[in-house]
């Protein structure tokens, strides 16, 4: 009998406490970048019952009403009812933002490559905001070149949010989680969905029977293609039996605690750095986007069925210290050729990435829920396939 394997990924809704924090951090970043594209921002957020704390380091001359940004973001998510224990108009907002360390700023503003060098390349000016390693990934399992488990998990919670905001399911509240287990065949191809777990916050009047039927009919069967569902598929919907208390009233939330949800659902490696609240000089964010950009174009070019790109940096240095590409035996050319081509085609210095992907714009709030990678509902520059021809030509 052929060997089959299971792989599981999860996602969370925009009303999950950690995602509320991510969205507030990125909303603050966007508000600052809209007025000062050169700003350096590292905004962290903590949320819990009735309270929001915003803290971190910022270098900018722009004025932003942090209190208003926080309240508007919470309202957009759907926390507008005091019964939820966390409401846009009544929550306490406590900002504590200070200027970026001058020791860090000197390495970011003047990279090692240009110090004392009169013949400067402008793209060498910005050094990496920290040391670290970042990964990008792509696989041909879905149209968006993402692993199927995380792609489906995101779509399930996005569908819940659509039904809640449209009023089609009136008893839904903002907090929700999804988890999808996919069965793979001996060729590592997805063949069926084995298990779906959905926990969704609800009004106290809603019955378990009503929630169960609505989630199956209006969420699971609307999102997951019927070809992946059979009579053996298992559905666990609100398996605790009750989910009325949720959001920050049920759990505290913090920026950067959903890094696997933000990326590939555990299917690929992760360097450990979070994204939200950070401007593009922070390579945790910008280099992760660049790595996804490389990986996606490699797979779209037919040079591999699966590709993982690792980039690594030293603080205050512009050029990456390493570029590594792994195609897991699916490549049509040598990995060394792909690495050479990536260095030729993609400028991987922080300033090069910022220019290549136009990252000084206020585009980040939209990425802070439902994944930073593989998005088909919004136009993100690192999801474009405009380097396919160049890669094909480079490896001839």
Swiss-Prot record:
Its cofactor is Mg(2+); K(+). L-methionine binds at residues 57, 100, 251, 282. One of its GO terms (molecular function) is ATP binding. Keywords: ATP-binding, Cytoplasm, Magnesium, Metal-binding, Nucleotide-binding, One-carbon metabolism, Potassium, Transferase. Pathway: Amino-acid biosynthesis; S-adenosyl-L-methionine biosynthesis; S-adenosyl-L-methionine from L-methionine: step 1/1. ATP binds at residues 16, 175-177, 242-243, 251, 257-258, 274, 278. One of its GO terms (biological process) is S-adenosylmethionine biosynthetic process. It comes from the Bacteria. Its EC number is 2.5.1.6. Mg(2+) binds at residue 18. It catalyses: L-methionine + ATP + H2O = S-adenosyl-L-methionine + phosphate + diphosphate. Catalyzes the formation of S-adenosylmethionine (AdoMet) from methionine and ATP. The overall synthetic reaction is composed of two sequential steps, AdoMet formation and the subsequent tripolyphosphate hydrolysis which occurs prior to release of AdoMet from the enzyme. This is S-adenosylmethionine synthase. It comes from Streptococcus pneumoniae (strain P1031).
């Amino acid at each position: 009998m052929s060997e089959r394997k299971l792989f599981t990924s999860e996602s969370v809704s925009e009303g999950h406490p950690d995602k509320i924090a991510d969205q507030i951090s990125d909303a603050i970043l966007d508000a600052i970048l809209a007025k000062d594209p050169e700003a350096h921002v590292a905004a962290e957020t903590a949320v819990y019952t009735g309270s929001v704390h915003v803290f971190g380091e910022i270098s900018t001359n722009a004025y932003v009403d942090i209190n208003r940004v926080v309240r508007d973001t919470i309202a957009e998510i759907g926390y507008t009812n005091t019964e939820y224990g966390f409401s846009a108009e009544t929550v306490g907002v406590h900002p504590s933002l200070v200027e970026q360390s001058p020791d860090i700023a000197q390495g970011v503003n003047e990279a090692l490559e240009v110090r004392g060098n009169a013949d400067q390349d402008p793209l060498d000016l910005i050094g990496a905001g920290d040391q670290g390693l970042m990964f990008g990934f792509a696989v041909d399992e879905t149209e968006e070149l993402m692993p199927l488990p995380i792609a489906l998990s995101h779509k399930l919670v996005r569908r819940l949010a659509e039904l809640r905001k449209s009023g089609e399911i009136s008893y839904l509240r903002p907090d929700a989680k999804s988890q999808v287990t996919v069965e793979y065949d001996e060729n590592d191809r997805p063949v069926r969905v084995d298990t779906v777990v959905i926990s969704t916050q609800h009004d106290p009047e809603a019955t378990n029977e009503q929630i169960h039927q609505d989630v199956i009919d209006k969420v699971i069967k609307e999102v997951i293609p019927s070809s992946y569902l059979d009579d053996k598929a298992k559905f666990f919907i609100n398996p605790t039996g009750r989910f009325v208390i949720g959001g920050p009233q049920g759990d505290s939330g913090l920026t950067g605690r959903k890094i696997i949800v933000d990326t590939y659902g555990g299917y690929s490696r992760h360097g450990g750095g979070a994204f939200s609240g950070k401007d593009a000089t922070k390579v945790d964010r910008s280099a992760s986007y660049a790595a996804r950009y490389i990986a996606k174009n490699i797979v779209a070019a037919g040079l591999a069925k699966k590709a993982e790109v690792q980039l690594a940096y030293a603080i205050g240095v512009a050029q990456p210290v390493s570029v590594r590409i792994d195609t897991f035996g699916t490549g049509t050319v040598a990995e060394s050729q792909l690495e050479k081509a990536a260095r030729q085609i993609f400028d991987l210095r922080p300033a090069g990435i910022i220019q290549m992907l136009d990252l000084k714009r206020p585009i980040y709030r939209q990425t802070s829920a439902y994944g930073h990678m593989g998005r088909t509902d919004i136009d993100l520059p690192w999801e474009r396939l405009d380097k396919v021809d160049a890669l094909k030509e480079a490896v001839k």
